[in-house]
């Protein structure tokens, strides 16, 4: 993903909320997606399931991004150690939290990630020197942080400017809820204002903006606005809508 983004190629993925069989990654790659994003905050995969998916993702050369239940050192360390290289960290409200996330995600000299022995997170590679291995792993990690509150947007530039933060996004429903516009006629307008602020700030700091979309038209709109990381819908939403559309025709 880092290489594709460096080449300015749009990366289109989807959320995995329901599937637990790692073979879902093979199917998504065969469908043409560029990556998958597995949710641990609002769904229930075990750390063993995440490890299995991470192993297959790397064998397939198909990036797997994981949202942990919390953006703390413990969860970031566990995910990296089982072989996850892409993090999508929720509830990053302050520059201090962003700094803690960035420090936990990479080894010295740019961070203070907890040192682990040989394992999936290091490709079991005992041949590289310690310095070369740490530099390689640091270069693979990609960190996206989620801004989901008014406080986060008050610190927008500081969070985005944090060294080690690669991309930013917003949590639309949590943000709308906090701003008091969830389910109101103004929700779309207010969220779009925040999306445009986020994109402008990301571009100003040389970082990426990521965006969740529900339709192809939404994706096209934000790509034209400069977004290069798109999360299109989810396994749950795509399955349900496809079955519902078919059943409506079969049982008119």
Residues covered by each model-derived region:
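Alpha-helix-loop-beta-strand connector modules within alpha/beta enzyme cores
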Residues: 47-81, 103-110, 135-138, 187-210, ...
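N-terminal amphipathic alpha-helix/helix-capping segment at the start of soluble metabolic enzymes
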Residues: 1-15, 127-139, 196-204
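Conserved beta-strand positions in the central sheet of alpha/beta enzyme cores
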Residues: 13, 36-37, 88, 169, ...
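Glycine-rich phosphate-binding active-site loops on the catalytic face of alpha/beta enzymes
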Residues: 86-100, 168-177, 227-246
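Conserved N-terminal beta1-alpha1 strand-loop-helix module at the mouth
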Residues: 1-64, 70-71, 103, 143, ...
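C-terminal alpha-helical cap/extension of soluble enzyme domains
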Residues: 72, 113-129, 141, 147-154, ...
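Conserved anion-binding
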Residues: 74, 86-163, 174-177
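Catalytic cores of alpha/beta
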Residues: 24-26, 30, 66, 71-85, ...
